[in-house]
């Protein structure tokens, strides 16, 4: 099963989501991985209420998939990737990250996570202020 995600409708409209899905499909074809499901999601990796992510979780829990292919860890979730991986493994589901070449230290991962959080909350804050000014 392929899971592709972008953060915004703008990224989806510019074709980023389709290109990501295509790269994942090509990877699966090259490695002879059968793909029964492709889930495309739009939303923040911090949001656990994403429709596609919840569909994926239901497929995992009901035993309908045995592999989940993602481009980067942060496409699945911004935080707690290893926790999600452990849960999926409990259901005999492997997560394959096709672009996992940037192994980083725990300190570097924490720094990236904090920067992601700041960017997310800053975007929400400034978006809210902008909306209030337009009213």
Listing of model-derived features with the role each one plays in the protein:
Residues 1-135:
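Short, structured surface patches at the beginning of a domain
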């Amino acid at each position: 099963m392929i899971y592709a995600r972008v953060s915004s409708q703008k990224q989806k409209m510019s074709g980023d989501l389709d290109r990501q899905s295509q790269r994942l499909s090509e990877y699966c074809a090259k490695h002879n991985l059968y793909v029964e499901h492709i889930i495309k999601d739009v939303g923040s990796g911090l949001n656990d209420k994403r429709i596609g992510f919840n569909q994926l979780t239901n497929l995992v829990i009901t035993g309908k998939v045995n592999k989940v292919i993602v481009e980067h860890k942060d496409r699945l979730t911004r935080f707690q990737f290893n926790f999600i991986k452990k849960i999926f493994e409990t259901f005999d589901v492997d997560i394959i990250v096709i672009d996992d070449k940037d192994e980083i230290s725990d300190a570097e991962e924490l720094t990236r996570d904090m920067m992601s959080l700041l960017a997310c909350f800053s975007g929400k804050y400034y978006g809210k202020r902008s909306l209030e000014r337009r009213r």
